[in-house]
């Protein structure tokens, strides 16, 4: 098995059901070798992973950190340490952050050895404060009064998944620096292991910002380089970041007010000096009474002289004079006023002569009388045609009223069905006592000497008078 670089007790902070607590573990740091990668393992109790000790050591579930994924190892300050005199440090990976603690000496040693193992290219040896400073050839000493503006204002944060962070490609751990005028997000370089600026947000473009026990969040405006959106960072120092941002904003406000006052004072003094050195040059004014030249401007660009507001184009009927036109100051007539007036009078005379045309603006819109309806505007559909049979319908309540009789005009009575003419009756002949063929010639001659015709139409009589012995009869409709 690989030999351990360092091992010892470490307190690991865990969070369960919203409660943070410290758990004491036994940590073992393994370097990179042909048999394994560099890693930090945690066990329940002291013991060697090679089988030594009482029954060997049992590793905690999912408690192994690969140092190849380590992003940073920095000391931090916690409010409630696991025991008095303990110092904490945070180990950040691409997935999450681990908060560890040990006594002061062990914590410093753990940070040093972890940095050497995780970042072998950098010189991470901690400076010994007890040793005197080494002078170079130029004999340069460190200035104890010098400190960068962001010292104490850099915080390790872990980006949380939001719409804005996904758009900017933020994932993992970064350093958030609170500067005097902006928030800057730093990341470690791929080769130099130096913090390089990635994004920044000026305070004047932040819409709002806030903090929680485990995170710090702010909303950027649309004019920020990152674009609009909310950025959330997980950190245990959210309150410290919030206070630093608030102090920077208040300081920037105070500087802005002082700068505005200085600018105003400088502007006033500069204006006073300018007025004392040089007086304004008088602008030549044109004489008020000089009339405009006739052809100074084209006809289309003639301007109406300033005066009271004129009435609208169709506010009054044609030819009417607005009230108060002759009172007050007389208006100056335009250049071609006489010509326009003459043309308007000619048009008015033409309209008055033509009596067929109606005036255009005599009546207001919408108040003209409605035209009379024609005779056939409202046709009525005839009903009961099968009963009327094209005859005039005569009923008492629909006939015209007669005021003389206080009644409706009653139609004349209808004629009854026509009766046919009476049938003609046959001629009744007196009965003769003699038989036919008996008698003398004289009687027969007297009987049939005359033929009687009836004037009744439809009746026919045929009478013939013969002289002889033959008997001639008269036939009628009544005879058989």
Swiss-Prot record:
Post-translational modifications reported in the UniProt record: Constitutively tyrosine-phosphorylated. Phosphorylated by TEC. Phosphorylated by LYN. Phosphorylated on tyrosine residues by the insulin receptor kinase. Results in the negative regulation of the insulin signaling pathway. Phosphorylated on tyrosine residues by SRMS.
Phosphoprotein keyword on record: yes
Cell location: Cytoplasm; Nucleus
SUPFAM superfamilies hit by this protein: PH domain-like (SSF50729)
Positions with biased composition (Basic and acidic residues): 265-276
UniProt biased composition (Low complexity): 253-262, 432-445
Domain observations: The PTB domain mediates receptor interaction.
Name listed for the protein in its UniProt record: Docking protein 1
Organism this protein belongs to: Rattus norvegicus
Name of the coding gene: Dok1
């Amino acid at each position: 098995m690989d030999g351990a670089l360092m091992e010892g007790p470490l307190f690991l902070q865990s969070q369960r059901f919203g409660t943070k607590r410290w758990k004491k573990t036994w940590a073992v740091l393994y370097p990179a070798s042909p048999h394994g990668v560099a890693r930090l393992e945690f066990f329940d109790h002291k013991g060697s992973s090679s089988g030594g000790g009482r029954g060997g050591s049992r590793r905690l579930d999912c408690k192994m950190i690969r140092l190849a994924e380590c992003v940073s190892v920095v000391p931090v300050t916690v409010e409630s340490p696991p025991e008095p005199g303990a110092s904490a440090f945070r180990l950040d990976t691409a997935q999450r952050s681990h908060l560890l603690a040990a006594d002061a000496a062990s914590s410093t040693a753990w940070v040093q050895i972890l940095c050497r193992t995780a970042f072998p290219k950098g010189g991470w040896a901690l400076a010994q404060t007890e040793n005197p400073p080494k002078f170079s050839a130029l004999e340069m000493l460190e200035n104890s009064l010098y400190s960068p503006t962001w010292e104490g204002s850099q915080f390790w944060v872990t980006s949380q998944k939001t719409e804005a962070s996904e758009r900017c490609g933020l994932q993992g751990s970064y350093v958030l620096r609170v500067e005097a005028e902006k928030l800057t997000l730093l990341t470690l370089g791929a080769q130099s292991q130096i913090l390089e600026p990635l994004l920044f947000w000026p305070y004047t473009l932040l819409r709002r910002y806030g903090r929680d026990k485990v995170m710090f969040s702010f909303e950027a405006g649309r004019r920020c380089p990152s674009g609009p959106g909310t950025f959330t960072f997980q950190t245990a120092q959210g309150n410290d970041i919030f206070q630093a941002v608030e102090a920077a904003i208040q300081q920037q406000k105070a500087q802005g007010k002082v700068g505005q006052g200085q600018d105003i004072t400088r502007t006033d003094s500069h204006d006073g000096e300018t007025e004392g050195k040089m007086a304004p040059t008088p602008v030549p004014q044109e004489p008020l009474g000089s009339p405009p030249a006739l052809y100074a401007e084209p006809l289309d660009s003639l301007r109406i002289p300033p005066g009271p507001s004129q009435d609208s184009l169709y506010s009054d009927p044609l030819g009417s004079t607005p009230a108060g036109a002759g009172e007050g100051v007389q208006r100056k007539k335009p250049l071609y006023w006489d010509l326009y007036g003459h043309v308007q009078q000619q048009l008015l005379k033409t309209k008055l002569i033509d009596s067929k045309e109606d005036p255009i603006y005599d009546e207001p819109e919408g108040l003209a009388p409605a035209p009379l309806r024609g005779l056939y505007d409202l046709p009525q559909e005839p009903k009961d045609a099968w009963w009327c049979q094209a005859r005039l319908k005569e009923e008492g309540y629909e006939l015209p009223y007669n005021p003389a009789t206080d009644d409706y005009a009653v139609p004349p009575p209808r004629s009854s069905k026509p009766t046919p003419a009476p049938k003609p009756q046959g001629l009744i002949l007196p009965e003769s006592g003699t038989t036919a063929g008996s008698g003398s010639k004289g009687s027969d001659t007297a009987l049939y000497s005359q033929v009687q015709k009836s004037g009744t139409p439809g009746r026919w009589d045929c009478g013939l008078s013969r002289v002889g012995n033959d008997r001639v009869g008269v036939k009628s409709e009544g005879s058989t």
